[in-house]
Amino acid sequence: LELAQEVAKRLGLEFVPQPIAWDAKDMELNSGTIDCIWNGFTMNGREDDYTWSTPYMDNSQVFVVTADSGIENFADLAGKIVEVQADSSAEAALKDNEELTGTFGTLQTTPDYNTAFMDLEMGAVDAIAMDVIVAGYQIEQRDDGDKYVVLEETLASEEYGIGFKKGNEELRDQVQTTLEDMAADGTLAEISDKWFGRDVTTIGK
């Protein structure tokens, strides 16, 4: 959100965050109700459906565990209770990895990650499968963030980009140039560090 705000400000455009129903995103974009989709929008598998910025962030699907759990890798998840948000990229990645999920004691879904972290804190589950970007944000925003660790092994990787209506190169180019300027002057890294505790951006690298 802050990244999009800064881009709009530099371009002299009014920033209007518009919540949408995710399954209506194409209709909203094609009708002109929104100008772009900029919300953890995965490029993979959609490369030809939109006019894209270059990827601004790499995202992986990972597991979060408590620091004292003794879980250090995928093998340690055998027999454990794993939770994942319903209809998330992490759930899709788990469905594609039956060899791994077959070792779990239980794989269950949750409606949101706040609930998942409460379950993990209470010991109701042993691990949460989720986006590394969201994991970093959740952990960074918690007073007890040092209680949690992200396993180094990753389930899958994807790239985040900004999706514009097919053919809208003019706005894409304006946004892209501004993002490159922000990467060069350190603003991208600064915003990323504020929200995620580290620089997770990829533009200009």
Per-segment meaning from a language model:
Residues 1-40, 185:
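Extracytoplasmic small-molecule ligand-binding "clamshell" domains
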Residues 1-10, 80-81, 88-89, 161-198:
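Extended ligand-binding regions for polar small-molecule ligands
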Residues 4-13, 90-111, 139-144:
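Ligand-binding cleft/hinge of the Venus flytrap
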Residues 16-27, 69, 107-122, 158:
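Short helix-initiation/N-cap motifs at beta->coil->alpha
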Residues 24, 40-49, 93-98, 121-122, ...:
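A ligand-binding cleft/hinge motif common to bilobed small-molecule-binding domains
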Residues 54, 65-82:
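Flexible hinge/capping segments at coil-to-helix
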Residues 58-65, 132-136, 140-180, 196-205:
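Periplasmic-binding protein-like
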Residues 75-91, 105:
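Short loop->beta-strand "edge-of-pocket" segments that line small-molecule binding or catalytic clefts
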